[in-house]
Design a protein with these regions (language model features):
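An exposed, glycine/acidic-rich loop-and-rim segment of catalytic or binding clefts
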Residues: 1-321
């Protein structure tokens, strides 16, 4: 299908591939090297058959929503409880990651994809138009997402690539730095407790570069700012054992970090016949803080008519020496 035929972007330093279904980032490579720096499947259809959100844009409401309920303007909007029958994760089984986006502009260095959601889609209000533009300049891949609506509606879209910079068996070979002083504590369902906590003297202190842990499972939202920035701000650095480095700058007020603890063990499904395994990639997801509609002290995610929701993220890569 054409929606799983990749769009290829090129610069003098990087190549990237995007699948129109899910606006999925399926490959990032240095021009002079063959290794894929994100999890990419040998069969592009496996990006959608294997439910790990690899490379997808997730939303319109990323992360977890308690009971799948969105309180808005005196009403409760019900989303699908697709996680243990209790929470809605990434807008349920029919979210943006499953949809066939239209290609509305394309050059060798950039591609813009678009999707329209009708009023009531995913149980949410408003006719919504969402555009995602991937572009490459030198060794920097940029993703800009913009959304508009004709009714107040929640909006929190996140990119979900899994990074693996050195091709080794798990992410414990990587070093991670997250420039955040606080994080969102959660309960056993990974729903916020309602406060934020300092990272100091906790397992979540990544303010200096240190190894990505395998235990306990890491799936936490770091608080980058109390609201969105107008321009991308540096927030994280990831370094592979071979010297490859990734720097992330974003306008988003949060960064969800997931160390891939619950990725399935599947033989030969990745490019070049490699296996997919637990901890086989790390997701670094700029976004708003989770379950914001139920947390009045968090940055809020309501998009109003005549406003534009916008998020810009730069992924700057440095090759091995």
């Amino acid at each position: 299908m054409t929606t799983t035929i990749p769009i290829h972007l090129r610069s003098d330093a990087l190549n990237a591939s995007i699948l129109p279904r899910g606006a999925t980032l399926s490959a990032v490579r240095f021009t002079q090297r063959s290794e894929n720096l994100v999890l990419g499947f040998a069969d592009p259809e496996d990006h959608f058959r294997i439910p790990v959100y690899a490379g997808h844009l997730v939303g319109p409401v990323a992360n977890r929503i308690k009971a799948g309920e969105i309180p808005l303007d005196g009403k409760i909007y019900q989303m699908t409880r697709n996680e243990n029958g209790e929470t809605c994760l990434h807008s349920g089984p029919d979210g943006l990651h499953t949809l066939d986006w239209d290609i509305v502009a394309r050059t060798d260095q950039s591609a813009t994809l678009q999707i329209d959601l009708k009023d009531g889609d995913q149980g949410l209000p408003g006719n919504r138009n969402i555009k995602a533009t991937y572009s490459i300049a030198g060794a920097c891949l940029t993703l800009e997402i913009a959304a508009r609506t004709d009714q107040p509606t929640p909006m929190n879209i996140a990119a979900h690539p899994y990074w693996m910079l050195d091709g080794l068996s798990d992410v414990s070979s990587h070093l991670l730095e997250v420039r955040a002083d606080s994080y969102v504590p959660t309960d056993s369902r990974n729903l916020p407790l309602g406060d934020i906590a300092p990272v100091a003297h906790t397992e979540f202190d990544f303010r200096t570069l240190r190894p990505v842990p395998l235990t306990p499972a890491l799936d936490v939202n770091f608080c980058l700012a109390p609201e969105s920035h107008t321009k991308p701000q540096s927030c994280a650095r990831l370094a592979g054992s071979n010297g490859t480095q990734l720097e992330i700058a974003t306008t988003a007020p949060g960064l969800q970090v997931y160390n891939g603890a619950f990725l399935p063990d599947l033989k030969g499904v990745l490019e070049n016949g490699h296996d997919l395994k637990p901890y086989g990639g790390i997701a670094l997801e700029p976004q708003f803080w989770p379950d914001a509609p139920h947390q009045p002290g968090f940055p809020q995610i309501t998009l109003n008519p005549r406003d534009t929701w916008r998020q810009i993220t730069h992924y700057r890569l440095t090759p091995p020496a």
